[in-house]
Swiss-Prot record:
Species annotation: Arabidopsis thaliana (Mouse-ear cress)
Function: Probable carboxypeptidase.
Family: Belongs to the peptidase S10 family.
Any single biological process term in GO: proteolysis
Protein name, per record: Serine carboxypeptidase-like 46
SUPFAM superfamilies, per the entry: alpha/beta-Hydrolases
GO cellular component, one term: endoplasmic reticulum
Single annotated GO MF: serine-type carboxypeptidase activity
């Protein structure tokens, strides 16, 4: 057989295999396509949701929700969003309370006018197994889960998810999240970089983490100064909270099941003065008194601007919506090993001591590898206050020898100050979001969208109206 004919046949075979692979992937993704969510207004973009099995032997599967970009999805990046906890849902919190296209309102969904899928294809992942609709056939899979397991599972998820959606393979990929995602996001990004050394699968373009847990002592001990500076605790209590028992010491003792009498005394006094009617995740706002959830998990923002109203019990509505059978059917979701979908898992046994393991060093390794890192903080959050995050970013910049390229200054959203920002080198940025809570996109959606656009574009935040 002539050489040219052999080459032609080989090329044809390769093209045929590629075509078959594409057809197979199309069938897989088509099965996950959402026709329409109950109560949803008409939209022009596609939605998908379903499962990716990350462990066939133990039947461990992670649940995802993809909201493609409102316009030109083919030309826009893919953004993975992870909520923290550990053990809280990126579907219920991220997609349906923060930056997704819809928010529940009674029996219907209303459009989020500041949804992040205006700028990107948004992928929300319920992780680890045991969170939300993600499940395992054996309850033992929910025990002893830790950061290492979660990072590996998230990597496997992405590898297999790309088999369903190969059209996203070469797309610019960003990883974002908040709170304990200060562990999830850097750890996943680190594994992706390591994997790319052999396989070059991920087109990672940057990470963004909001009010993130990055270094146990610095993050949590900044709470005392925040409480005091905002008038939530008295001078004597502030002194006790910084000298007799700081918050990282209390948490460390609490996680080990042996809280000292001194820490019990100090935290009791702090609790009395701050009161249980203050949302620690947003100290300026009201709480949802009849909430079916723990108060500490409810984000209750005030109106962002004149004429805008916000439901302070939004998480209640999300819980009710996602527990509807018709909604679960539309999402291709099912409950395994639990009777009810919850915002934060009540079956997951996570290794709480992992919170004490710093990830700021991993963030530094990402910066050195050329991955842009954006750390942002809602300035009304007392749980992971901006002061701790700002200190950590500044310290990291000094350790890496990065010069300041954007001096500390205000940035604008519309005709108002959106917050303050500083940039080091070309890869490390910090910003505050004025008036925002722990969950920035929920409490300040317009400002969060401005920040998100700048992050995706690799640009400094606006310094003019």
């Amino acid at each position: 057989m002539p050489r040219l004919q052999c080459l032609t046949m080989a090329t044809s075979l390769i093209l045929l295999l590629q075509a078959l692979s594409l057809v197979s992937s199309t069938i897989l993704s088509r099965a996950d396509r959402i026709t329409r969510l109950p109560g949803q207004p008409r939209v022009g973009f596609q939605q998908y949701s379903g499962y990716v099995t990350i462990d066939e032997k133990k039947q461990r599967a992670l649940f995802y929700y993809l909201a493609e970009a409102e316009t030109k999805p083919i030309s826009k990046p893919l953004v993975l969003w992870l909520n923290g906890g550990p053990g809280c849902s990126s579907l219920g919190v991220g997609a349906f309370s923060e930056n997704g296209p819809f928010r529940p309102k009674g029996s219907i969904l209303v459009r989020n006018q500041h949804s992040w899928n205006q700028e990107a294809n948004m992928l929300y992942l319920e992780t680890p197994v045991g969170v939300g609709f993600s499940y395992a056939n054996e309850s033992s899979s929910y025990e002893g889960v830790n950061d290492k397991i979660t990072a590996k599972d998230n990597l496997v998820f992405l590898q297999k998810w790309f088999l369903k959606f190969p059209q996203y393979l070469n797309r610019s990929l960003f990883i974002t999240g908040e709170s304990y995602a200060g562990h999830y996001v850097p750890q996943l990004a680190q594994l992706m970089i390591q994997y790319n050394k052999k396989h070059n699968l991920f087109n990672l373009k940057g990470i963004a983490i909001g009010n993130p847990v990055m270094e146990f002592a610095t993050d949590f001990n900044s709470r005392a100064e925040y409480f005091w500076s905002h008038g939530l605790i008295s001078d004597p209590t502030y002194k006790l909270f910084t000298s007799s028992c700081n918050y990282s010491r209390f948490l460390s003792e609490y996680h080990r099941g042996s809280v000292s009498s001194m820490c019990t005394k100090v935290l009791s006094q702090v609790g009395i003065e701050t009161s249980r009617f203050i949302d620690k995740y947003d100290v300026t706002l009201d709480v949802c008194i009849p909430s079916v959830l723990s108060q500490s998990k409810v984000v209750s923002p005030q109106p962002q601007q004149v004429g805008e109203t916000v439901d302070v019990c939004l998480e209640d509505e999300t819980v009710n919506y996602l527990n509807r059978r018709d909604v679960q059917k539309a999402l291709h979701a099912r409950l395994v090993g639990t009777r009810k979908w919850t915002v934060c898992s009540d079956v997951l046994d996570y290794e709480v001591l992992d919170v004490e393991v710093p990830t700021i060093n991993i963030v530094g390794s990402l910066v050195k590898a050329g991955v842009p890192v954006f750390v942002y903080s809602g300035d009304q959050d007392s749980v992971i206050p901006l002061t701790g995050s700002r200190t950590l970013v500044k310290r990291l910049a000094e350790e890496l020898g990065l010069r300041t390229t954007v001096p500390y200054r205000v940035w604008f959203a519309g005709q108002q100050v959106g917050g303050w920002t500083q940039v080091y080198g070309n890869t490390l940025a910090f910003a505050t979001v004025r008036g925002a809570a722990h969950e920035v996109p929920f409490s300040q959606p317009a400002r969060a969208l401005v920040l998100f656009k700048a992050f995706l574009g690799g640009r400094p935040l606006p310094e003019e109206f």
